[in-house]
Design a protein with these regions (language model features):
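Gly/Ala-rich beta-loop-alpha elbow adjacent to hydrolase catalytic centers
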Residues: 94-99, 103
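Conserved serine/cysteine hydrolase catalytic core
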Residues: 190-237, 241-245, 249-255
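Secretory targeting and sorting signals
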Residues: 1-30
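Flexible "cap/lid" loop of the alpha/beta hydrolase fold
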Residues: 110-111, 116-159, 196-199
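Active-site catalytic motif of lipid deacylating hydrolases and related acyltransferases
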Residues: 31-87
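Active-site glycine-rich loops that stabilize anionic/oxyanionic intermediates
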Residues: 41-44, 97-98, 120
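Post-His helix in hydrolase/transferase enzymes
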Residues: 252-266
Length: 267
């Protein structure tokens, strides 16, 4: 499927080049608008992107919000790749939180730019938990009792079981999304998905962000991934970086600003 998409894209590029060489105006349809793929992070599901996705669709973008299984970078990036395999043409790949780890492990020739929203952006051999190192990057409140562990059924785990982490409901609003309304926080809690503890300890592969046009939105009031850690990762990537006065859940609390950055990356 990826090969077919690549051939289609190459053929379209050739047609555009030939038309441009002939001095003929290129019609709007000949420059396909990228499809935006939004990858959610831990303690969330695709509905966390609803506000952003709605704004992008309102501007004419095709948007996909695949399910991130939250099992580990290798497994989860394969799941996202399957979603990308359904897309013809260029792709803007966006990740929030742990979703940044996942998109950093997706290598697709049709990706033209990447956007990280308060997200992990590991380099090769790193694991996400290193970005929460309390010595280098103090400030995360994602600790017990806010962070809890439970056993779950999981085909990826040993003997079909695994240990997952989740945010205790009574701490979710204060730790994860302190800048959203009570009703919004309650809806986010209802959609919370737990993550395999091993996922944040699995070494990342070669980063797809290397050599790629990248944008990074730092959540300046983040209580999950310290802002200093986010700025370090963004700087290492060479990303175009902006700060939002927002919680970790900036995609929910500030969907206009997040959507605007994605549109910039898609232009």
């Amino acid at each position: 499927m990826t090969i077919i998409r690549t051939l289609r894209t190459a053929l379209l590029s050739l047609i555009i080049a030939l038309v441009a060489t002939a001095g003929v105006a290129i019609p709007a349809w000949a420059a396909p608008r990228p499809t935006v793929v939004l990858v959610h992070g831990a303690f969330a599901d695709p509905t966390s992107w609803n506000g952003v996705a709605g704004r992008l669709r309102g501007q004419g973008y095709e948007v996909l919000t695949p399910v991130n299984p939250l099992r580990g970078p290798a497994h989860d990036s394969a799941a996202v790749q399957r979603a990308l395999d359904t897309v013809d043409g260029p792709i803007v790949l966006v990740g929030h939180s742990y979703g940044g780890t996942v998109i950093s492990n997706v290598h697709d020739p049709d990706i033209v730019s990447m956007v990280y929203v308060a997200a992990f952006a590991p380099t090769q051999g790193e694991f996400a938990q290193q970005a929460l190192d309390p010595v280098r990057f103090p400030g995360s409140r994602l600790l017990p009792p806010a962070l809890q562990v439970k056993a779950v059924d999981d085909p990826q785990g040993i003997a079909g079981r695994n240990l997952d982490g989740y945010v205790a409901p009574e701490y979710f609003h204060d730790v994860f999304a302190q800048d959203v309304a009570d009703a919004t926080a309650a809806d986010m809690i209802a959609h919370q998905q737990s993550i395999a503890l091993a996922a944040n300890l699995e070494p990342s592969g070669a980063p797809s962000w290397s050599g790629m046009p990248t944008w990074y939105l730092v959540s300046a009031q983040d209580r999950v991934i310290p802002p200093a850690s986010q700025r370090f990762m963004a700087g290492r990537m060479g990303a175009q970086t902006s700060d939002l006065d927002a919680s970790h859940a900036s995609l929910v609390s500030q969907p206009d600003a997040v959507a605007a950055t994605i549109v910039t990356a898609a232009s």
